[in-house]
Amino acid sequence: MTNVQRSRRQVRLSRALGIALTPKAQRIFEKRPYAPGEHGRDRRRTESDYAVRMREKQRLRAQYGISEKQLRAAYEKATRTAGQTGNAMLTDLETRLDNLVLRAGFARTTAQARQFVVHRHILVDGNIVDRPSYRVKPGQTIQVKAKSQTMVPFQIAAEGVHRDVLPAVPGYLDVNLPSLKATVTRKPEVEEIPVQVNIQYVVEFYAR
């Protein structure tokens, strides 16, 4: 799939789910905030409880750019954690390495952040980690490796260009953008996680 095809797919998915998944999707979604297709603007059907919960699950998946298998694994892990399952699920997903690369402003989109990790541009506590699903713990530091910082995409990021299209840096991250370095200072709080989802619906979908 080419970059153009991937971009178009993300725009269509954004309109179908009612959320902007990329900066480009945000611009188009503002102009056409309805589902794609000939009858998208006039769609008014009543959805079943199952359909509502399934769409909410799809919205969460899309915002983190993960597979169904990965999301279900996060749910199963959360059910074994003390406290509310939905909150545990969200805070766990938020600490994925690819997500933190995005939150820190080192990348413009989730897909780009994942690519940076897979291509071995990202260090965790000084060591290369090429697994996007790696969970970063409080006290750990992520940084773009020195050799990679000379690349144009990272030079752009270091100038703060992506900050105009990304949510504000969450309180659990201490970011030094010019150095392309960020430290997780504490566990994320649910209220500061910038995703649009009714997490209880997601829990109910998997618990059915």
Curated annotation (Swiss-Prot):
Residues 95-161 form the S4 RNA-binding domain. One of its GO terms (biological process) is translation. One of its GO terms (cellular component) is small ribosomal subunit. The keyword RNA-binding applies. GO terms for molecular function: rRNA binding; structural constituent of ribosome. Residues 30-49 are annotated as: Disordered. It comes from the Bacteria. The keyword Zinc-finger does not apply. Keywords: Ribonucleoprotein, Ribosomal protein, RNA-binding, rRNA-binding. One of the primary rRNA binding proteins, it binds directly to 16S rRNA where it nucleates assembly of the body of the 30S subunit. With S5 and S12 plays an important role in translational accuracy. Belongs to the universal ribosomal protein uS4 family. PANTHER family: 30S 40S RIBOSOMAL PROTEIN, SMALL RIBOSOMAL SUBUNIT PROTEIN US4M. Part of the 30S ribosomal subunit. Contacts protein S5. The interaction surface between S4 and S5 is involved in control of translational fidelity. This is Small ribosomal subunit protein uS4. It comes from Bifidobacterium longum (strain NCC 2705). The lineage of its organism: Bacteria, Bacillati, Actinomycetota, Actinomycetes, Bifidobacteriales.
